[in-house]
Amino acid sequence: MCIRDSIYAALLKIAEMAFNVSTIHEAGYICSMLFIIPGFPFITSGIDLAKLDLRSGLERLAYAIIIVMVATMFAWIMALLLQLKPMDFEDLDLGPVLHLILRLIMSFFGVFGFSIMFNSPASMAATAALIGAIANSLRLELVDLTGMPAPAAAFAGALTAGLLASFIKENNGYPRISLTVPSIVIMVPGLYLYRAIYNFGIMALSDAVSWFASAIMIIIALPLGLIFARILTDKTFRYCT
């Protein structure tokens, strides 16, 4: 993580000197760390707890929390050393149609990458990526176009991913979990978690609590969306054994 942030800061400084790139782009260092946030155990822990598999659920949740705390703490320390700040991103001067198309494309490749990291075959990764592109773009469009709160939009996106995965499972036999979890890992609010810890570190407690509360709500909403989709499409999942 130290190497990653140092490389980003060095490349940004070179870009500033060589190409007069604005310092507003230093906010992009946050994006370089988001893949470290353990979305898979966060989401699967919620599914395990819904099935009353408490041991697996609590173990995965504890593991995810430990990784998040270590990752965000180190990122905060490196941000202080390199004088990086998690500023807001600049608004994109794009039309709504082009913005949606780019979201679909970027979401596809983001989910595809996560799925490959989970050792999925290319065909399964592409299927999960297609689901994720639709679900994540829906989530973002709901927030931007309707003003829906981010947790509610995350629930809608996860529910959509779960329903699509269930439909595809019936036709090609891919394991449901191999499609649903990678497709919504991209929705895990790593940015919110990092900003919460950063603001705690600089004692901006009001901002820290706000970011942390938003992150918790989204983290809860994501597995809930998958759980509701599973309840609607899988009769055996509706009952405890």
Question: Which role does the model predict for each range below?
Answer:
Residues 1-3:
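Short, small-residue-biased leader/transition segments that mark boundaries at the very start
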Residues 19-24, 82-96, 199-210:
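Membrane-interface helix termini and inter-helical loops of multi-pass transporters
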Residues 20, 83, 118-119, 147, ...:
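Short helix-capping/hinge motifs at transmembrane helix termini and TM-loop junctions
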Residues 30-43, 63-145:
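Generic multipass alpha-helical transmembrane bundles of integral membrane proteins
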